[in-house]
A protein has these predicted regions:
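Long, C-terminal-biased catalytic regions of enzyme "large/alpha" subunits
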Residues: 1-82, 289, 296, 318
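Non-heme di-metal
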Residues: 82-337
């Protein structure tokens, strides 16, 4: 095979003959044999063999054949280049096997809210918290639930736009976890008596400001344009899976850490935060792949647009934190933190 590939390169530039190709192939064999002598475990990859062929051709008198061989390799590499948006019908081989690792990651973190006991949490909320603390918890729970219950169908639709079986499996696994999150926070709203308060959220300016920037982040999630959809993956991963939730997670868990209260709810929040971190990391990995496959999409204008949205998100989330502490800050967790 090596001789044949070299011979084709020589024929393409009308330089050398079969014997010349055999001589170069022999030098390739000798080079690989020397490596084997130094390391008995050494088994060359196809890429390594091709690299040696390039080197031996460049060091021979057949420089034009070397150039032809290099150009052919580059052309073949481009033909093999992956495309995240190109449909693949066959299950295997996976084009993105490392992404499938997110499936067992979620499976290993599996939980349901019925595993936790909330009896003491109800007592804490109704009778042990001060008015300002109760207000902070109420608003925090409403803010989390607005995200977890209302706006999380993105991953379940992923395969329709990124039709790779391994990526579809991740999306479906994430979608199942989002259903568990929605069930958990729906249950917490119920036991804390906050269902009616949840209905009033649309009258809260801070929450509606957040809704507007999140809607902007999601506006391209139904787009048929690959570039626009790629932007929605980035914005969803950044803002909905990360930015919009973690300040509220910190507040809830601080009550358990500093006051030994709300243990059950804190357990739910901790379990949720671990899965949301996994979701966000997956989205970031998708963006890294898209950057590699479509570098021309990520222009200065694109980066500026993302930066502007980050600033808008920061201002909106500041307002949410102000609203959470509308009846006073917590002694053990100042608003500035």
């Amino acid at each position: 095979k090596i001789t044949g590939a070299i011979n084709k390169a020589m024929l393409a530039v009308e330089s050398g003959n079969t014997e010349s190709a055999q001589n170069v192939a022999l030098s390739v064999y000798k080079t690989l044999l020397e490596r084997k002598k130094k390391d008995q475990e050494y088994v060359p990859t196809i890429e390594e063999v091709q690299d040696v062929v390039e080197t031996q051709l460049m060091e021979s008198e057949f420089k034009e054949a070397a150039k032809a061989y290099i150009l052919y390799r580059n052309k073949r590499a481009q033909q093999r280049q992956t495309d995240l948006f190109e449909k693949r019908i066959n299950l295997k081989p996976y084009e993105y096997p490392h992404l499938y690792e997110y499936v067992p990651a979620i499976r290993h973190s599996y939980w349901i809210h019925s595993e936790f006991n909330f009896t003491s949490d109800i007592q804490d909320f109704k009778s042990r918290l001060s008015d300002s603390e109760r207000s902070a918890i109420k608003n925090t729970m409403l803010a989390i639930s607005q995200i977890e219950v209302a706006v999380k169908s993105f991953w379940g639709d992923l395969y329709h736009r990124v039709p790779k079986p391994e990526i579809g499996s991740v999306g479906s696994t994430f979608a199942e976890s989002e259903v568990r999150h929605a069930d958990a926070y729906s249950h917490l709203l119920e036991i804390l008596g906050l269902n009616n308060e949840f209905k009033k959220l649309k009258k809260k300016p801070a929450i509606m400001k957040r809704v507007r920037y999140l809607e902007t982040a999601l506006k391209n999630s139904r787009s048929d344009d690959n570039r626009e959809y790629a932007e929605s993956i980035l914005l969803f991963s950044l803002f909905i899976e990360h930015v919009s939730l973690f300040s509220q997670f910190l507040i809830i868990m601080a009550f358990n850490k500093h006051k030994n209260m709300l243990k059950g709810i804190s357990n739910v929040v901790e379990a949720t935060s671990k899965e949301e971190q996994i979701h966000g990391d997956f989205g970031i990995d998708l963006i890294k792949i898209l950057q590699k496959e479509n570098p021309d999409w990520f222009t200065k204008e694109y980066h500026k647009n993302i930066q502007n949205m980050c600033k808008e998100a920061f201002e909106a989330e500041k307002d949410v934190v102000d609203w959470i502490f509308e009846k006073g800050e917590l002694d053990f967790l100042p608003k500035a933190v």
